Amino acid sequence: MAGPGYDRVDSKDDEPPNIQIPSRTYGFPPEAFDWSRLPDFDTNFLPPEHVEAFIQALSAPDPIPPTPDGGATGSSSYRLNSPAWHRGSTTSFDLDLARRPESSGVGFHDEDRTARDSPAGAATAAAAGVATPGPPLSRRASSNSLFISARNDWAPISQRRVARAKTAPQSSSRNDKKKKRARSKDETREGYLYPLLKWPLLGVVTCWLVGLSVVHVLARLYITVYERYWAWRGERGRLRRAMRATARYSDWVAAARRMDDFLGNDSWKVDDAFAYYDNKTVRRVLAEMRRSRRRAEEAGGRDTEQGREAIEDLKVLIEACVKNNFAGIENPRLYSQTYYGTKNLVQNFIDEVERSLKFLVETERLSKEEKRVMFKGICANYGRTALCLSGGATFAYYHFGVVKALLEEDYLPDIITGTSGGALVAALVATRTNEELKELLIPALACRITACREPISVWFRRWWATGARFDSVDWARQCAWWTRGSLTFREAYERTGRILNVSCVPADQHSPTILCNYLTSPDCVIWSAVLASAAVPGILNPVVLLMKTRSGQLLPYSFGHKWKDGSLRTDIPIKALNLQFNVNFTIVSQVNPHINLFFFSSRGSVGQPVTHRRGRGWRGGYLGTVLVQFTKLDLTKWLRVLRSLELLPRPLGQDWSLLWLQDFGGTVTVWPRCLLSDFARILSDPDPARLARMIHEGQQSAFPKLRFVANRLRVERLVERGRRENRRGGGLGDGGVGSSGGAGGGAGGGQAEAVAGQAAGPGTGQRRPSFESILSEDDLRSLLKKRRVERGGIGSGETESEDETSDLDADFYEGITYDGGDDDAGLEFGAAGMRQPGVATPAGLGGVERGDLS
C-alpha cells in the first residue's frame, strides 16, 4: 500500500512495513501496532477527476498583478466557467460579456498559452506524472469558453493584441522572482541615511540577537540541571517518574494526588484565601445559590409562592455568576499551585453551579420561552471553548496525544482549529466521529504518514527546479485520506458536529488572512485548505483553494488566488474565533520548535507548580529566572525594532519576523516535551515506535490541564443543553447537528443527532447558516412583519400577537434551517462567495441570497 489516498500498487516499496513491536510500548497493546486494524486503511477517497481539477487550478495563470501606474503587468487572463462557477443560479450582478470561439484569437493571448505550457507552469503536473500538453481539458472540451482579459480597467476586453517576440534572456523569470521578493517602491522609505545605515544596523542587531540567544540557551540549561539534580532528587523525583510513566488519566490522577500529599499542597486547597480570586464573593454566592436550589427542590412540582420565589432567585443568581472568569475562578494561577485540583471553595462553587443549571434545565415551572431567553444570555456571557493546534512540521504529531487525552475523558471541544501541521491533525479529528478516532489514534497510524518518504535524490531536484521540496499534487493525494476525500467544511460539520477552522495566509504580503470554516467558506474542500495552511515557502509552493459545486465538481475558490502557511501570521487565531464563534476559552497545543525553546513559566503553569519552597519559589532560583526572562524579553524587543525600522530582508519573499512576534499561547497552553533528536528529524516521517512516544508525551502534557478544562466544559455543556432544548420553533435545528449548532453543545449527543438527521433524508440533515446569523431576531421579525403587511395579510390598525409572529417565522424557516446561537457571536460571511442551492429566499429581501451576503 502506498501513501494516503493512493490506489493499491503491486510494489514492495509501497507496501506497509512489517508489524514490529518495539521494546517500549508506552502502554499500547500489541495490536495497536498492527496497521491492518486501521479503519479505511486501503481506501482511496480521492477520485482521479479531483486530482485533475487540482492540477488544472495550479497550472492556471495567476490573477493580473497591479503595476505602479495602476495598470496590469503581462497579459494574464482569468477564465470563468460561468455555469459551474455561479453554481447554477443567478447572481446579484450581471456581466454583459460575449462568448467567442477560441479559434478566433479574441479574448486570449499567445503569451497565456506560452506561460501555461512553460516548464515553470507545468512543473507541478510533471512532478506528479501527469502529462499536460496543450491547454487544459476544460478549454479543449469547449469552444465557447468565456474569457475576461484586459490590461487595465479602461482597455476594451475584446481588443486583439499581437504578441511580441520574446527577447528577454532565460534568466528573466529568476530576476522577476527576485523583484517580487524585494520590497516595492511603496514599501521602502525615502532618505539618504536609510540605505547607508540599513545594513550596518542590521549587522549590529543580528550579532546582539545571536549573543542573547546563546545566553538564553545557557540559562535554560542551567535551570534544567538545577531542577534535575536539586529539585527532583529523592522521593519527589521518584513520584515524578511515576507520574510520567502512566498511560491512563486515572493512573496519573492517583500519582498526582500522592505528589500533592507529599509536598503538602492539600493544605493550600483547604484555605479559601488567595490573592488571585475574590473568595468572599464566591463564598456568599455559593451559599445563596445552594439555599435557593434546595428551597426550589423542596417545593417539588407544587406551584406555590415560595417555590416560584426560590426559582426566580436561583435564576437571577445563575444569570449573574455564570460568566467567563466570574470573580476570577478561571484564573490559571488557581490551578498552578497543585498537581491536581484547585481550591476546595472553587471546586464546590463549580459543582453547585452544575447542579443548579441541571435543575433549571429540567424544571417544568419555567416556561420554554423563559428558558430560551435565560440560556441565550448565559451562553453569550459564558462563551465557548476551542482547541487550537499549532504548526510545527513533524512536531505536529504530538497533537495526537493531546487529542487522545481529551477524547478518552470526553473533554474534546466542538470547535477545533489547526494551522500548518496542526491543520492535518485537526482535519482528521473534525472528519471522524469519536468511535472512529479511538481506533485511529494508535501507533499504527504511522503507516499513513508518508509525506516525507522521498529520498534526497528526488526531492532535491524538485527543489532546485521549482523552489519547493515537496510536490503539491502528491501531498493532495496523501492528505485526502486524512480528510475522508473531498469533504467540505460544511459536510464535515454535518457529519461529526465539530467545527473545523483552518488558517490560511494569501500569497500577497498585504492581503488579509482567512479562517476557513463552515461559515466563512462552507463549500471549500478541506484538503486544499490543509495544503494551503502547510505551504511554507521553500517547502511547499502556494496552492489554490478548491470549492465543491452542487454536482461534485471542484473549481478554484476565491478567484484562483494562491495561499500559504497560516503560521506565518496567525498560528493561533484567537481573535477570529472570538468574533465568529464567541470563543473566550482556548486550549492551545503549542509544538512550534522555534517557540518551544523560549517558553518558560517562572512561577509554574496549570498542573505543574514550582516544586521547591511549597510552590512560592522561582524555577531555577531567582537568578536563573532573571537570566531567562531578561534574554527572552530583550530578544522580542530587538525583533520588533528590526521589523519597525524595515531592516529585515525578505528571504523567499516572506517577512519572517512574525514567526516570533505572535501570541502563541491561550487560556491553557499545552507544551509537549520533545527530544533533541526531533529537531534533526523535523522533516522525516515517524515510525510506529516514534509515534507511540509522541502520543505518550502529548498525553502526559495534557493530563495536568484536564481538571481545569473539565470544570469549564461541565458548565458550558449544560448551558448548551439548555439552549438546544429550548430553541424557538420546537427545535428547528434538530435535522442538523445538535451539539454544535450555532452556539454549540455537548460532545456526545450532537453526533447521534447528526447521524439521525442525515438518515432522515436530504434537506433534513443539512445545516446552513441562516439569516439569523447576520440579522438579530428583532430585525428579522420586523422585516417579515413588514413584508406581510405589504402583502395585505395584516390589516390597517391591527396588531400581531406572538403566536402570529411564530407562524410567520415558520413560513420563512421552511427554506432555511434555524442556526441557533450564531446571532450571539457576531458572525459574518466574510469569504463564503457561494450560494447554497435549494435555500428559499424571503420575498422581502429583494432576491438577495446567501452567496451575496459577503
UniProtKB/Swiss-Prot annotation:
Provide GO CC annotations from the record: membrane
In which residue ranges is the amino acid composition biased (Low complexity)?
A: 119-132, 752-761
Q: What processes does the entry annotate via GO biological process terms?
A: lipid catabolic process; triglyceride metabolic process
User: How would you classify this enzyme at the top EC level?
Assistant: hydrolase
Basic and acidic residues bias: where?
96-116
Would you identify the family this protein belongs to, as annotated?
A: Belongs to the PLPL family.
Name by which UniProt lists this protein = Patatin-like phospholipase domain-containing protein CHGG_02900
The source organism is Chaetomium globosum (strain ATCC 6205 / CBS 148.51 / DSM 1962 / NBRC 6347 / NRRL 1970) (Soil fungus)
